[in-house]
Design a protein with these regions (language model features):
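Short proline/glycine- and polar residue-rich coil/turn motifs
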Residues: 63-70
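C-terminal interaction-tip segments
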Residues: 1-33, 37-40, 46, 90-108
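Exposed aromatic-hydrophobic patches
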Residues: 70-77
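Surface-exposed loop/turn positions
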Residues: 27, 69, 82-84
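Noncatalytic modules at the cell exterior or secretory-pathway interfaces
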Residues: 77-92
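Short, surface-exposed beta-strand/strand-loop-strand elements in extracellular ectodomains
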Residues: 40-63
Length: 108
């Protein structure tokens, strides 16, 4: 069993939910930080998780960000299971970006 720290970056090209990170089929993951940066103006970001065991999307964070500012929308650790998907949706296609800090736990 190996623990690996990873970063997943977010820089939207569409206003639809975009996959930022997918948990490998042989691992679990703990999301420790979801940091979003708004360069200017007012933007909305939504964070969701697709639970692969139930094929259901759950919104886990919502941020109305007036820039310029940086905010962390993860208010605590988020545990993801095998094949779960973390997605971020933005109200605009530019001026907002971010990073997700993840501890991936390989179960092999």
């Amino acid at each position: 069993m190996a623990n690996v720290y990873k970063n997943a970056f977010f820089d939207p090209t569409t206003t639809a939910a975009e996959t930022v990170y997918t948990v490998p089929s042989n691992a679990r993951a703990i999301v420790q930080n979801i940091q979003l940066t708004n360069e200017s103006g007012s933007k909305v970001a939504k964070v969701s998780v697709t639970d692969s065991s139930a094929t259901t999307d759950y919104q886990i964070a919502y941020a109305d960000i007036t820039g310029p500012t940086i905010c962390n929308v993860a208010k605590g650790p988020v545990v993801l299971e095998e094949n779960d998907v973390l997605k971020i949706e933005s109200s605009v296609t530019s001026g907002i970006s971010g990073i997700v800090s993840i501890l991936e736990i390989n179960r092999e």
